[in-house]
Amino acid sequence: MHCPFCRHPDSRVVDSREADEGQAIRRRRSCPECGRRFTTVETAVLSVVKRSGVTEPFSREKVVKGVRRACQGRQVDNDSLNLLAQQVEDAVRASGSAEIPSNEVGLAILDPLRNLDEVAYLRFASVYKSFSSAADFEREITDMREHAETRAADKASGAETVSVD
């Protein structure tokens, strides 16, 4: 690692710690040439493979932007959107794969969005799942009602559910 101060091509790691809830490693380094210290943060790169085959780095901002569009006119704050994006990133990282298809990112968005705002969920799902008729919306609304009833029943019985849609 080059020193950012004197550009010396080597540095020594003084301390390493987990950061960002284990998603990154923060390293404190020292330059043997100038003696100054600096910090680096290392993260595993997560790439999204688009339908065209092109890969690009996963972006929480892109998730927030897409979900924000679905939430337009709804009472959803930025903190909730950022939390949703973090949940999506955690879910796709949990797959253990360095490259994830874009449709899996979309699937990872659906469940947390359903829990956040049902109208925004319907808007997002209608685009993501390519709804072409009112029947598609009706079917999705029926699924949402069943999902809500199941969650309510599980909550009443004290059971915890994990949704696998």
From Swiss-Prot:
A Pfam family assignment: Zn_ribbon_NrdR
UniProt-listed InterPro entries: ATP-cone_dom, NrdR-like_N, RNR_NrdR-like
A GO biological-process term: negative regulation of DNA-templated transcription
Record keywords, A-Z: ATP-binding, DNA-binding, Metal-binding, Nucleotide-binding, Repressor, Transcription, Transcription regulation, Zinc, Zinc-finger
Flavoprotein recorded as keyword: no
Classification via PROSITE patterns: ATP_CONE (PS51161)
Cofactor note: Binds 1 zinc ion.
Domain of life: Bacteria
Residue runs in coiled coils: none
Obligatory cofactor(s): Zn(2+)
Zinc finger annotations (unnamed) as residue ranges: 3-34
A Gene Ontology molecular function term of the record: ATP binding
ATP-cone domain mapped to chain residues: 46-136
The family this protein is said to belong to: Belongs to the NrdR family.
Record function comment: Negatively regulates transcription of bacterial ribonucleotide reductase nrd genes and operons by binding to NrdR-boxes.
Name of this protein: Transcriptional repressor NrdR
Gene: nrdR
